[in-house]
Amino acid sequence: SGSKTANIGDGCFGVPIDHIGSTSGMGCGSPRPKPTPGGS
C-alpha cells in the first residue's frame, strides 16, 4: 500500500525493512540482495 516503504525496504510483510530487518532480520530486503516471492 505504501510505495515508499516497498521502494526503500521492500518488506515482504509490509513493514519497514529499516526496523524489522535490522532487529529480526525477517525483512526480505535486508538479509538478501533480492527478495524472493514467498517469504523466507
Swiss-Prot record:
It is found in: Secreted. The keyword Secreted applies. InterPro entries: Natr_peptide, Natr_peptide_CS. One of its GO terms (cellular component) is extracellular region. Residues 1-8 form a propeptide. Keywords: Disulfide bond, Hypotensive agent, Secreted, Toxin, Vasoactive, Vasodilator. Disulfide bonds join 12-28. GO terms for biological process: regulation of blood pressure; vasodilation. GO terms for molecular function: hormone activity; toxin activity. Residues 1-40 are annotated as: Disordered. Transmembrane segments: none annotated. Expressed by the venom gland. Belongs to the natriuretic peptide family. Snake venom natriuretic peptide that targets both NPR1 and NPR2. Exhibits hypotensive and vasodepressor activities. This is Natriuretic peptide PpNP-a. It comes from Pseudechis porphyriacus (Red-bellied black snake). The lineage of its organism: Eukaryota, Metazoa, Chordata, Craniata, Vertebrata.
